[in-house]
UniProtKB/Swiss-Prot annotation:
It comes from the Bacteria. Signal peptide: none annotated. Belongs to the carbamoyltransferase HypF family. The keyword Iron-sulfur does not apply. The lineage of its organism: Bacteria, Pseudomonadati, Pseudomonadota, Betaproteobacteria, Burkholderiales. The keyword Ribonucleoprotein does not apply. One of its GO terms (molecular function) is zinc ion binding. GO terms for biological process: protein maturation. Keywords: Plasmid. This is Carbamoyltransferase HypF homolog. Coiled coil: none annotated. InterPro entries: Carbamoyltrans_HypF-like, HypF_C, HypF_C_2.
């Protein structure tokens, strides 16, 4: 177990949080102290589920009394969710569901003991949204007592569902589809993945068969990697994004950043649309010159950071706020996190990243616990299941 001390003045009722599905870690929030379990890994492995079972019992023993609630992710099928609900029933306390991206920003609010609202940028691979769809590129308004979704990245179809997250060429095919260029999928990817596979994915996209949509920032990284020929299939999580970052770092260490013109727009609903950037990446790939993949990788990072800064800064100005919290696993990308922080600072805003916990799912439990600890006392009736919803934004 690892102890973390929150800023002086923090005082929280004891809450147990069971964490996420990927990179799972649980925590006990009590007063100004957070007691962390080890990182168990992904809960698709039964051994990791057993380890989580043991950890939560140790955390409960460390509470030295009754916890007020047990917090968990919004997704009902996660083992961590089901465990939290069983524990809550056993302890006669409420189980509190906390939306994934809200929890990412809440973890920052807990770490910095923020008492006023912030704008949150939560960028990662996936998390269940309050509307039942897959989120992952979220612009949020978050206060200690409530939150709402201000906007999100333009959603992309995922041909084959979760398979698309493992095969960046599928996300590149999805990018072609949203650019009304579905007919190019076979020509661009047939020789690499097989003509039949390319035709099948093109047909799935045309007919919207098994193509759930997601606003995930991680899938935009995959689409960029696939468009530039950097990655076709991944052997590990975020492999394509890491390769893309490495190429961008090499380019930017030797050359000036590429110009970003016409790479994004934000619509009236707060949706950040990067299709202009996709068009430019495919154009670079078509040039076929040495070094164009690295230039495209640099362009993707620079343009994405510029878009995120403008998007968040406009939201902060519109809501009269000065702080932007940056959460989610995509901010492990050093180029992206440094560029967004610098860009926001240039706009007179304070940009916060986690210091003591991971910005990814390994730090999510702190946000879950912080949100649950702030539920109205009257709502925390024994054996209730509370599902927090983002309030409509003004």
């Amino acid at each position: 177990m690892r102890a973390q001390t929150l800023p002086a003045g923090s005082d929280h009722a004891p809450v147990l949080a069971c964490g996420a599905w990927l990179k799972n870690a649980a925590c006990l929030l009590r007063g100004a102290e957070v007691l962390w379990s080890p990182i168990h890994g992904d809960l698709g492995d039964p051994a990791n589920c057993d380890a989580l079972d043991q950890s939560v019992e140790q955390l409960l023993d460390s509470a030295h009394g009754q916890v007020q609630a047990v917090a968990h992710d919004l997704h009902p099928d996660f083992y961590s969710t089901q465990l939290a609900q069983r524990l809550a029933a056993r302890l006669c306390v409420p189980a509190v569901a906390v939306q994934h991206h809200h929890a990412h920003i809440a973890a920052l609010m807990a770490e910095y003991d923020l008492r006023e609202p912030v704008i949150g940028l939560a960028l990662d691979g996936v998390g269940l949204g309050t509307d039942g769809t897959a989120w992952g590129g979220e612009l949020l308004w978050v206060s200690p007592s409530e939150w709402c979704r201000l906007g999100h990245l333009q959603s992309l179809p995922l041909p084959g569902g979760d398979v698309a997250a493992r095969e960046p060429w599928r996300m590149a095919a999805a990018a072609l589809h949203v650019l009304d260029r579905t007919g190019e999928i076979g020509r661009r990817y047939g020789a690499v993945v097989g003509e039949q596979a390319a035709r099948t994915v093109a047909a799935m996209l045309e007919r919207q068969l098994n193509c759930p949509r997601s606003s995930s920032a991680g899938r935009w990284f995959d689409a960029a990697a696939g468009a530039l020929g950097v990655s076709v299939r991944q052997q590990a999580e975020a492999q394509a994004a890491i390769a893309l970052e490495a190429l961008a770092a090499d380019y930017l260490s030797a050359l000036s950043p590429p110009e970003c013109v016409g790479t994004y727009v934000v619509d009236q609903d707060g949706v950040l649309d990067l299709r202009g950037l996709l068009e430019q990446l495919f154009a670079l790939a078509d040039e076929g010159q040495a070094g164009q993949a690295a230039r495209g990788a640099a362009l993707f990072h620079v343009a994405l950071a510029e878009a995120l800064v403008g998007w968040a800064a406009d939201a902060a100005q519109g809501h009269g706020l000065k702080t932007v919290a940056l959460g989610g696993g995509c901010f492990m990308n050093g180029i992206l996190s440094a560029s967004v922080q610098a860009g926001l600072a240039a706009r007179g805003l304070q940009a916060l990243l986690p210091r003591a916990v991971s910005c990814g799912d390994a730090g999510l439990a702190l946000g879950q616990a912080w949100v649950a600890a702030r539920q109205p006392t009257a709502a925390l009736a024994p054996q209730t299941h509370l599902q927090e919803e983002g309030a409509p934004c003004a």
